[in-house]
Structures are given as structure tokens and as C-alpha cells.
Amino acid sequence: MSSFDKTMKFNFSDDSAETNVNEVLITVYDALQEKGYNPINQIVGYLLSGDPAYIPRHQDARNLIRKLERDELIEELVKSYLETHKEA
């Protein structure tokens, strides 16, 4: 069996990073709203493309979001969505 046939485990476990991701996303969201953009569309554009031009420099939002890996942002968004919407 080649190494391409094996499932790799992807794991994040740093709770302080989770808080940081939340703070960054909220700051970026607020900055986008203040500048008159649709925050959801702009954040999705950034996550899909990796192009920081989707995020304004206002409130240092562009620099903050670039300090995080996009997969960290996506992980936090998925985790938050599932925790909010999973059935009991």
C-alpha cells in the first residue's frame, strides 16, 4: 500500500489559537462593515483565493488576517457552525 492510499490525520489543538482566530474574524468583520463592504462575501473571497485585497487595511484587519493560515480560519468557522447547528 503506497503512502497515497493512507488517510492522514489533520489536527489542531491549541485553544489560545481558537480565541485568536475568533478575535481576528470579529475585527475583520467589523472593519469590513465600517468600510461599507459585505463582510461575508469579502471573507469568503479571501478564504477561497488567499488574496488579501479582499480585506481592508482599516483597523489593521489585513495584517491581522494574514497572520493566520486560511485552514485555521476555515477550521474555526466549520467548528463554530457545527457546534451551533448540530442536533442534540
UniProtKB/Swiss-Prot annotation:
Transmembrane segments: none
InterPro entries associated with the record: IreB
Family (UniProt): Belongs to the UPF0297 family.
PANTHER family named among the record's database cross-references: UPF0297 PROTEIN YRZL
Protein name: UPF0297 protein BPUM_2379
Organism: Bacillus pumilus (strain SAFR-032)
